[in-house]
Design a protein with these regions (language model features):
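Intrinsically disordered, low-complexity terminal regions
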Residues: 2-370
Length: 370
């Protein structure tokens, strides 16, 4: 038994050694190249800047000058000098400036090997070693500029920006400070952090996004996790997401198989939810209206004690409905073949708020005072 173990360990050690030797040899033969290019352009309030990149980062900084500076660094690594020369011929930056439009685009001429390059770059980014291609942009712009950014297999870093912003990012990280203008943000297989937003349209898939304050968000998402501190108006179209919202004034939209958690709700909601769950930890007194249509969606509402509410709850015969044990007046009646309807008031005094729930299928509904 001991001899067998000894042989097994020797064999394993030999296999590891044989695996490491070619890697070491390959690394020692790597050939590298670095090229840098810069361009400078005048800018006005009507100017739009567009950057399209692959395999690297885009960093946008603001300055006080009425001009745009674009600095691009290209890092290349190959296993032989001839392959490196081929790679140098294949990759360059294309600059275009026409009137009020400025564009810098990463060009990769050898499209025949495009898929293999992208797959290899994904592996390189994940391991952090042996990167074949890395193209990084550092851009300096006036804060009022409109900016369009597209990046694949890389990151985007944003300073404060007051102009319109359009971001399309896949397989990377977005880190932005204050985005004050209208914006459109598409994230796919990405992570993002935004300190504050004005009005934005978001398309988020297979991503994690954390946001601070926002004025108005129109969000289409799937298989993502969204954290948001505060928003005035939020519209969602959600599939298989997890939402964590700290403070929401107006909440509208649709969801399927999503979990929605709101800590502080202020004013109005209109939601249509299939499967999943909705929890509102604190519904402020004096809210205007809450409407939720639930199709196999569990609901938990926790009310501030000063709330005065008219309620109308349609619930399936297999649904479980729990209403407050105090400050409640309710009547229940049969509504159709499979449903009951509970109507009445919650709280003390003349109602000023409206709560309506249509629970079409089996679910759990819990409403209580805090």
């Amino acid at each position: 038994m001991k001899r067998t173990d000894h042989i097994r360990y020797k064999t394993a050690g030999l296999m590891i050694l044989l695996t490491l030797l070619p890697c070491t040899a390959a690394r020692s033969q790597n050939h590298t190249d670095k090229r840098s290019v810069s361009r400078y352009y005048p800018a006005t309030l009507e100017t739009t800047l567009e950057i399209r990149n692959k395999y690297g980062k885009i960093q946008v900084e603001t300055w006080e000058k009425d001009s745009v500076a674009i600095h691009a660094d290209i890092f290349l690594t190959e296993s032989s000098a001839s392959k490196l020369r081929k790679l140098q011929d294949d990759i360059h930056i294309d600059f275009t400036a026409t009137g009020t439009y400025i564009m810098a685009k990463t060009m990769i001429e050898s499209e025949k090997g495009r898929l293999a390059r992208e797959l290899k770059s994904i592996e390189n980014i994940l391991t952090g070693t042996n990167k074949q291609v890395e193209i990084n942009y550092r851009v300096q712009v006036p804060g009022y500029l409109d900016v369009v950014l597209q990046n694949k297999f890389g990151d985007i870093y944003m300073d404060d920006l007051g102009g319109r912003l359009d971001i399309d990012l896949s397989n990377g990280v977005l880190n932005a400070n204050r985005i004050e203008g209208n914006s459109t943000i598409n994230l796919s297989f990405a992570n993002g952090m935004i300190r504050s937003l004005g009005s934005a349209t978001l398309d988020i898939s297979y991503s994690d996004l954390t946001m601070g304050r926002a004025n108005q968000l129109d969000m289409d998402s799937k298989s993502s996790t969204i954290n948001l501190d505060s928003v005035n108006v939020l519209k969602i179209n959600s599939r298989r997401d997890k939402f964590y919202f700290k403070k929401v004034e107006y909440l509208y939209g649709n969801s399927s198989f999503s979990q929605v958690w709101v800590y502080d709700f202020i004013r109005e909601s209109d939601l249509y939810m299939k499967y999943g769950g909705l929890t509102i930890e604190n519904i402020r007194a004096g809210f205007s209206r809450i409407f939720v249509e639930s199709d196999y969606t569990d609901i938990s509402f926790y009310l501030e004690r000063d709330n005065r509410i008219n309620f109308d709850i349609l619930h399936h015969e297999n649904a479980v409905l729990r209403l407050p044990a105090e400050m409640l007046y309710a009547e229940e009646s049969i509504d159709g073949k499979d449903h009951f309807r509970s109507v009445g008031t919650m709280g003390e005094g003349e109602p000023v708020s409206e709560l309506r729930v249509d629970a079409l299928q089996k679910c759990y509904i819990n409403i209580s005072f805090k």
